[in-house]
UniProtKB/Swiss-Prot annotation:
Catalytic activity: tRNA(Asx) + L-aspartate + ATP = L-aspartyl-tRNA(Asx) + AMP + diphosphate
Subunit description: Homodimer.
One GO term (biological process): aspartyl-tRNA aminoacylation
Gene3D superfamilies per the UniProt record, alphabetical: Bira Bifunctional Protein, Domain 2, GAD-like domain, Nucleic acid-binding proteins
One cellular component term from this protein's GO annotations in UniProt: cytoplasm
Binding-site residues, L-aspartate: E175, R221, H451, R492
SUPFAM superfamilies: Class II aaRS and biotin synthetases (SSF55681), GAD domain-like (SSF55261), Nucleic acid-binding proteins (SSF50249)
Keywords: Aminoacyl-tRNA synthetase, ATP-binding, Cytoplasm, Ligase, Nucleotide-binding, Protein biosynthesis
Family per similarity comment: Belongs to the class-II aminoacyl-tRNA synthetase family. Type 1 subfamily.
Positions bearing the site annotation: Important for tRNA non-discrimination: H33
Name this polypeptide is given: Aspartate--tRNA(Asp/Asn) ligase
Region (Aspartate): 199-202
InterPro entries per record: Aa-tRNA-synt_II (IPR004364), aa-tRNA-synth_II (IPR006195), aa-tRNA-synth_II/BPL/LPL (IPR045864), Asp-tRNA-ligase_1 (IPR004524), Asp-tRNA-ligase_1_N (IPR047089), Asp/Asn-tRNA-synth_IIb (IPR002312), AspRS_core (IPR047090), GAD-like_sf (IPR004115)
Amino acid sequence: MHLYRTHTCGQLRASDTGSKVRLSGWVHRKRDHGGLIFIDLRDHYGLTQLVVSPSTPGFDLVEHVRAESVIRVDGEVVARSAETVNPNLPTGEIEVVVRQVEVLSEAAELPLPVFGEPEYPEDIRLKYRYLDLRRETLHRNIVLRSQVIQSIRRRMIDQGFLEFQTPILTASSPEGARDFLVPSRLHPTKFYALPQAPQQFKQLLMVSGFDRYFQIAPCFRDEDLRADRSLEFYQLDVEMSFVTQDDVFAAIEPVMHGVFTEFGEGKPVTPYPFPRIPYREAIAKYGSDKPDLRNPIEMQDVSEHFRGGGFGLFARILEDAKNAVWAIPGPKGGSRAFCDRMNSWAQGEGQPGLGYIFWSDDQGGWGGPIAKNLGPEKTDGLMKALGLGQGDAAFFVAGDPKVFYKFAGAARTKVGTDLKLIDEGRFEFCWIVDFPMFEWSDEEKKYDFSHNPFSMPQGELDALLNKEPGEIVAYQYDIVCNGHELCSGAIRNHRPDVMLKAFEIAGYGPEVVEEQFGGMLNAFRHGAPPHGGLAPGIDRIVMLLAGETAIREVIAFPLNQQGQDLLMNAPSEVSEKQLKELHIRLAPPIKA
């Protein structure tokens, strides 16, 4: 017989009745029923109920053993009586009558309960993560993560992609977030950087003659944390040669659709090809470049209904040509109480308020200050244009859309959530396309790159030479699911002349480009194929599939929101000897 087990704790069935077995695992729960002790024994695979009688050798050990101690038992599989069968367990038709028991590892008093999964402070959960990971939900999430990565890898290989690894120690890059720097002992005063993404290396692989690359790549960014962002994360890094934007979409859509169908527990997934929404349309309709399409609300520009009179405040705002009035429909939100709550919410968001019109049963028509000023005829025309009628409401935001669009998008989300318009039981995908190549900086009084400086502008060099920078759009795209940006991608700028001109428009001379990106630029001078790619985030994909709201719930050993590893006590101080070897002298910040 094997030293520790003949079966796992999730394996035994009624067909095993009468078998002599050996099991090892954790004491999940212990119950004393009139002399007989019942133990739920747990391992990675499941639970098995044990029955220990006073005559069993080691019974006194079992009486005093704590939860989460590790034990080994020998015993016989017996069928449970009909009234004690547990239909919720795969092993629920049997139990093991223990003949011998040995404690392999006794547990101390637990700082964190495993059974029952009560809510517990995150700092305790992270400090004792090995206990937290024993809890069913988190354990299942980490298994799901492994399965999702296996599925992604299989689907990519089936499409002819090859998996390569790129360097972890690389050069610091000026674009994007802050780098994590690693001092070089062999080269004093110089530093490596941990990669924010394998961006330049994957492009160099295409220049090297490879055609389809992927990698489950670790990435590191020294940036502010939030629920769906971490200092270290993994992404499905992808690059392809001789492709258009459509080719990239056609390659990745079956992977995303397949993975979400496989692990989405029956929730409908957007069929591919996924909808494509131009960036400016997404901002105008949803107030966001990562819209949640489960929310049916679409905002509309209703400036013409207010221009020149009616509601004086909006009319005055519209005298400035750059301003607009946007409407946020609120189907079935037609009550003063709901409108007042929305107005209070807006004030809590730092806004002066939120204009509204609502259906008033008392008046038998539209109510609210805006309706009163517009008059019945204009108000009726406005609400009909929004597709609204009895029982509905509409909310209004006025000013410069560049300033208010994020707030308008948040109001759309708030209305959809509070009115329960969002279908939680589905995965809605879309592409956001046609991102602006450049944006004007009022602070610096110049154009700069809106997003990725290495994207190919639509129209290439001709567009850069003959269009206003603010009108140029890039072959850049994001994939969005349920309001979460899963990745960004682009068709790359593989031509040195186009790249240098793009950087020139953004205020960077050729000497700066050569200094900071000379390696890649020089490679492009030796024959570079048109290429493009993207990089969906593994953590966010698993978070959505697991139904979690924070990526820490799908990472085995995450950092907390202050960027600390409470289990391993990182970051930590290092010895003076280590600093000396690296030629580093510390200059701590002076406390005020």
